[in-house]
Structure formats: C-alpha cells, structure tokens
Regions:
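Conserved catalytic core of sirtuin-type NAD+-dependent deacylases
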Residues: 2, 6-302
Length: 302
C-alpha cells in the first residue's frame, strides 16, 4: 500500500524467538527417550571448574600437559604432580550443579540411556547418574606405570602431604578457583614448586600417573567401545557443553550421522558439530537443564 514503511525486525525479539524454538526442539528430542548424552567441560563450569575453549576458557592462559611430555620427562612428571596436588583440593571440593542433577533425574525417568563425558571430575556419578562412561578417565584414580596397580587420589594426597609438609598451605589463601584448569592442575611458577617431592607406588616405588587421557593420547579401546555401543543403540545424541574441537568427542557426532541419528547441541558458543545438528542452543547448562527436567518430568507427573 502506498505510504506504508517497512521496519527492520527487532533483533532482540528474533533472538528470543530463535532461543524459544531451540529449547522446544531440545524438549522434543529428550521427550522421545532413548537419548545418549555427550558432555564436555561446559557442564561443570557451574561447579566452579573452568572449561578449555569457552569465553573464559583456560586454553587462553594455560597449555595442558601432553602425554609425550609426561611419559618422556621425569621433571615434567614432578611438575605435573606438584601443580595437580594443589589443584586437586579444588576439584575434590567441587559438587554437582543443577545441570548434573537434572541429567540424573532424566536418566532415572527413562529418558536418557546414559552419559559419555569428556570430563575427569566424576561429577556425573556424584549427581546420581548410573550409566556414565568417563571417556577421558577420572582424576580420583591413579595408576602405577610399572606394576599397573590402581589406587585412589585421596590416598596419594595423604602421602604427598606427608612428604611435603606445608606445601599446599602456601596457596590455600589465594583465589585458586580462577586458576585451576579442567585437567585438575594449577598454573604455578617453577620457583614455587622447586622443593616439591613426588612419591612412588606404595607397592613397587614405580612412577605414578593419573587415570586420565592426556592431550596427545588416545582413549582406551574398551572405553571407546562402550561409548560407541551406547550411541549405536540410542535414538538421538545430545551434546552438552562441548566445543567438539577434539576428535575424541567429535567422532560421536560423525558416528551419529552415519547411523542416521539426530544430534542436538547445547553449548555456550559455536561448536565443530553445529552444521550436523538438528538444532543448536546457546545457553548455560546449569540453568537450561533444570528447566528441561522440570517441564518434562512435571508433564509426566500430570
């Protein structure tokens, strides 16, 4: 009609509508049941453990220990354990956040088949999730590199405190939460750990290693097989809090595509798998997952 003027769309309204539609897609995906979940560091930021590649990710400030460094250099191992000894206390104090608990509720209700996590903090199991595959291991376990005996991190911590009296107290008063990395260590200067003494295996005195997959290492075949089995029997794959930058996680998106399984992604920021997803939602998991659980389980109760 003559005389009418067109107005550009309200960007805030468009963004709100897009988020509402993405959440509706998330709700529909999970409501159908049979969902395998893949989680990354973004699920644990609400518990005070930073991620690697998010807006404030630790990779911007910290280069993680690689498998090659840890295995080839005794001094690198000592440095790792000194930094990890300080960081472990922060990780050990971390508790599941509402996002972890919401996933446990959805699994208990029969909507989720299980969780494959790239995290090493053990928070999914602590929240009550039953079928959890710790793809990259668990910081709460340590292994002897010589005899293969597995031990607990709690026992190692007691032995390290006895061998290094007062060491951890030097850093106890500082703002460690901002400095702890997702792999459980803390960025410390070499001069701060020069006198740190590492202990060996209590059985054979061999070198110890954490039961985690370092950067540059491969996921143990049996663990990978368990994760693939979970995905292969699922109706859908839901990726939560992972940028999918490393192949250990992205491979499951590729596998889902091969199987014709729909993929949904919830993450703060873009991911490597966005173009393969039926929806993406940029959201904080500790907020969106409790809402999802409340809507689905509340609807089931009615």
């Amino acid at each position: 009609m003559a005389g009418t003027t067109s107005h550009p769309p309200n960007r805030a309204a468009v963004a709100f509508y897009a988020r509402a539609m993405a959440f509706a897609s998330l709700r529909d995906l999970v409501a159908g049941g049979g969902v395998a979940v893949l989680t990354g560091a973004g699920i644990s930021t609400g518990s005070g453990i930073p991620d690697y590649r998010g807006p404030n990710g630790s990779l911007r400030r910290h280069t993680p220990m690689t498998y090659q460094q840890f295995t080839r250099d005794a001094e690198s191992r000592r440095r790792y354990w000194a930094r990890s000894h300080v960081g472990w206390h922060h990780v050990a104090r971390a508790r599941p956040n509402p996002g972890h608990r919401a996933l446990a509720e959805l699994e208990a209700a029969g909507l989720l088949d299980g969780v494959v996590t790239q995290n090493v903090d053990g928070l999914h199991s602590a929240a009550g999730s039953q079928r959890v595959i710790d793809l990259h291991g668990n910081l709460a376990r340590v292994r002897c590199r010589s005899c293969g005996v597995m031990g607990t991190r709690a026992d190692l911590d007691r032995r390290l405190r006895a061998a290094n009296p007062g060491f951890g107290l030097r850093f106890a008063a500082g703002p460690l939460g901002a400095e702890v990395n997702p792999d459980g260590d803390v960025t410390l200067a070499d001069r701060e750990i020069a006198d740190f003494v590492m202990v060996g295996c209590p059985g054979c005195e061999g070198d110890l290693e954490p039961d985690v997959v370092f950067f540059g290492a491969t996921v143990p075949p049996e663990r990978l097989a368990s994760a693939v089995t979970l995905l292969s029997s699922a109706r859908a794959l839901l990726v939560l809090g992972s940028s999918l930058a490393v192949m250990s996680g992205y491979r499951f998106v590729l596998r889902a595509a091969e199987l014709g399984i729909p993929v949904g992604i919830v993450n703060q920021g873009p991911t490597r798998g966005d173009t393969r997803a039926v929806f993406t939602l940029d959201a904080q998991l500790s907020a969106v997952l409790p809402r999802l659980s409340a809507e689905l389980l509340g609807a089931a109760a009615r």
